[in-house]
Amino acid sequence: RADESTVTFLDDGRHFIVRQETDAGYMHLYLYDIDRGLVRPITRGPWEVTALAGVRGQQAYYLSTEVSPGQRDLYRIRLDGSGKVRLTEGRAFCSVAPGAGMDYYIQTLSNASSPNRVEVRDHRGRLVRTLEENAELRGELARMKLPEREFFALPTERGDTLRAWMIRPADFDPARR
């Protein structure tokens, strides 16, 4: 379905980007010309583009599951599909609030083992300023010595993969029953 979350018009007045499902069932980005129709796919692969964060010149910024289905990373790619760069680091779930023209954006990173970190970054992904480190909460959680979550995948009889996690007691001993 075409709406503001799946269609983005470019400043040239002639092109737009559509986030749509491929034949294989993955959401990807496609460049269209208003008069000629489809120009080319911008992204492709066995992973999802979950959002188009913005466009800056001839580059698209998008969030995807390329590293892992349980992770979101921000990428930059040229509209011709070349020059893809992952802008996020580590293992986290990234969300982005883009500024005008993607000159700057606010990036929120979260994961199961640490509190959110909120940063301002420039269009190259360079850190400009940390808005929220959550250092006090991070320290308090470390003092509590909470057990870590263990993430894993379970294959089904149909060939699907179910993602799961488990928390074991802090004093867990796998040899003890």
Locations of regions flagged by a protein language model:
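Non-catalytic accessory segments flanking enzyme active sites
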Residues: 1-7, 19, 50-55, 63, ...
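Short loop/turn segments that connect beta-strands within beta-propeller blades
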Residues: 33-37, 78-82, 123-124
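A short beta-strand motif characteristic of beta-propeller blades
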Residues: 38-43, 83-88
